[in-house]
């Protein structure tokens, strides 16, 4: 294989308000704790089971840090795209520690707020135009999903098209 891919996609809920810190360089970083859950019914007992995984997310992109600081709260539902990285450090007792995190670098990664418990409703951190991307109007679609027409006096795009095929 010529290359490799390191991409993580999560849709989950924040377990706490974002933690915002400043680095020595003056750059700001947001740390998020995101829970993803899966549920199933036990075949033998019929009992409903649930398993929750907790993920550490670190955001280095200043614009996304601002979005996290202003709009995200405990319980907010988010869509995250980032890269998996493992950090290694030595604690106060001299023991080596490891932490695996989903990292959103300055120019890579995505954070989209989805409607849900936190009261947020489909705001996207990415750019976008009035025909799609950006705000998705309720968080039901992300990543280009369904397009909506802009509101206002503009005519719809299809009004300019002729119904007849020219050949």
Swiss-Prot record:
InterPro entries registered for this protein in UniProt: NA-bd_OB-fold, Primosome_PriB/ssb, ssDNA-bd
Any one Gene Ontology BP term: DNA repair
Q: List the GO molecular function terms.
A: single-stranded DNA binding
Ranges of the DNA-binding region feature: 54-60
Q: Does the keyword Ribonucleoprotein apply?
A: no
The annotated regions of Gly residues compositional bias extend over: 118-146
The record's Gene Ontology cellular component field reads:
nucleoid
- Extent of motif Important for interaction with partner proteins: 162-167
Query: Positions of the region Disordered?
Result: 118-167
SUPFAM superfamilies recorded: Nucleic acid-binding proteins
Instruction: Answer yes or no on keyword DNA-binding.
Output: yes
Keyword entries, A-Z: DNA damage, DNA recombination, DNA repair, DNA replication, DNA-binding
Q: Which Pfam families match?
A: SSB
Give every SSB domain span. 5-111
Which NCBIfam families does the entry mention?
ssb (TIGR00621)
Q: Which HAMAP family match?
A: SSB
Quaternary structure (record) = Homotetramer.
Q: What exactly does this protein do?
A: Plays an important role in DNA replication, recombination and repair. Binds to ssDNA and to an array of partner proteins to recruit them to their sites of action during DNA metabolism.
Please give the name of this protein.
Single-stranded DNA-binding protein
Please report the organism this UniProt entry assigns to the protein.
Answer: Caulobacter vibrioides (strain ATCC 19089 / CIP 103742 / CB 15) (Caulobacter crescentus)
